[in-house]
Amino acid sequence: TLLASSAASDVYKRQLLENGDVVSSQDFTSKNQQEVKDGELLTGLLGEKEKFAPGKKYKEELSVQNSGNIDTFVRVILTKSWQDKEGKKNTTLSPDLIELNFLTANGWVVADQQTTDERTVLYYTKAVKAGDTTPALSDTLRIDPKIATEVEKTVKDKTITYTYKYNGYTFHIDAEVDAVQTHNAKDAIKSAWGVDVNVSDDETTMSLQ
């Protein structure tokens, strides 16, 4: 999923990339015209006839491309969940077992105060020029192997049954990508995201307060 917050005119175009491929995109113009193309993450996680293995690391490189005509700062909100066959979230199952390895030595930072077990908020601290793509904010995904130890015991008519808690559930990751202009970025970010930041005089870098 790719959503947007825009705080200025001109043309905002950003794309969410997964392992180099466009998953979602959104175009926004000063005339309040929007074109949104939503996609789904993790659909290409497994190879043909490959079975998923808890504990194994799978390639999951997420990045953002600025395909608009103005420079922007971007943030990404990732939400992890377990869902049943009908797509209903089960909030009693732990999103912590869905592990993305975040890369924070390349300009991305995790906003700890805005992050929960279910939701991770990341900011790219450098301006993304028109036409450029950020470095990957993550590189791998794995499911904690202790998922196999999560069992429920039931007793009926002297018969004991053990059932894996996560049977019948699939894991999901939703990504929301937001962008604001670099011009007057401090005020634009506060207005659009409600976040206080420091912005360099040349408006090429920012940091959380």
Locations of regions flagged by a protein language model:
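Single conserved hydrophobic/aromatic residue that forms the stacking wall/gate
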Residues: 1-8, 12
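Generic structural "secondary-structure junction" signal
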Residues: 4, 18-19, 54, 182
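Extracellular and organelle-lumenal recognition/adhesion modules and their flexible linkers in secreted
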Residues: 5-6, 35-42, 63
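A surface/secretory-pathway sequence property marking extracellular, secreted
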Residues: 10-35, 83-121
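C-terminal, structured domain-capping segment
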Residues: 50-82, 128-209
